[in-house]
């Protein structure tokens, strides 16, 4: 069991307790297909590598996609400063809702805090480009999401899930426009890279939001 799974069990000890039958038979679990589905749901809820493997199988994320992401590394690295500046200094601090979490008690943009968050986002992107889809990486992704909710973050911090999805969608299209500009003369490479990043984004989004749904994960 991973560190994050162990922490989850401590946060929700009822999930770790042995389930005792109430005496009522659930006929659904007599159906082999439903029983297998339940076991898969249970196993992929707490074992982060099984969760990744299942999601990768669902979206058909393969070694070819990993190679495509590696192909995009030079483009990302060459434009990393511009990408981060755009996300933080053009999008986040100017959005009427998203910017709320980057303001001080007087409502002014807290530039030092923005710079800290920008540096953390850079670390996140660099870790993605390492293409190491191991337990350490996925626990890191989960932690990045978890600190945005009271479970593992600050008690008064809760970033609504739709804002996360909006920002991930924004980053997604920004990167794709960048790839389209850089690879306009190589449509096949563009297809490989954008397809791979799309699949990876959906897997990351799933793991990122695990602790948003802790009580019934």
What are these regions (language model features)?
Residues 12, 21, 48-66, 70, ...:
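Heme-based O2/NO sensor domains and their adjacent alpha-helical segments
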């Amino acid at each position: 069991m991973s560190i994050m799974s162990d922490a989850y069990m401590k946060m929700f000890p009822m999930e770790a307790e042995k389930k005792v039958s109430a005496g009522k038979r659930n006929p659904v679990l007599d159906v082999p297909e439903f029983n297998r589905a339940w076991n898969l749901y249970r196993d992929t809820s707490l074992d982060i590598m099984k969760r990744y493997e299942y999601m990768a199988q669902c979206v058909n994320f393969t070694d070819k996609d990993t190679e495509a992401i590696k192909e995009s590394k030079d483009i990302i690295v060459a434009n990393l400063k511009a990408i981060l500046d755009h996300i933080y200094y053009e999008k986040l601090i100017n959005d009427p809702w998203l910017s709320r979490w980057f303001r001080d008690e007087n409502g002014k943009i807290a530039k030092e805090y923005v710079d800290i968050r920008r540096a953390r986002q850079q670390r996140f992107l660099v870790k993605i480009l390492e293409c190491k889809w191991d337990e350490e990486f996925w626990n890191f992704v989960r932690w990045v999401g978890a600190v945005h909710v009271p479970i593992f973050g600050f008690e008064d911090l809760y970033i609504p899930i739709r804002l996360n999805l909006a920002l991930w969608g924004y980053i997604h299209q920004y990167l794709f426009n960048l790839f389209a500009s850089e690879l306009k003369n190589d449509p096949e490479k563009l297809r490989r890279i954008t397809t791979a990043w799309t699949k990876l984004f959906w897997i990351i989004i799933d793991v990122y939001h695990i602790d948003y749904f802790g009580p019934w994960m």
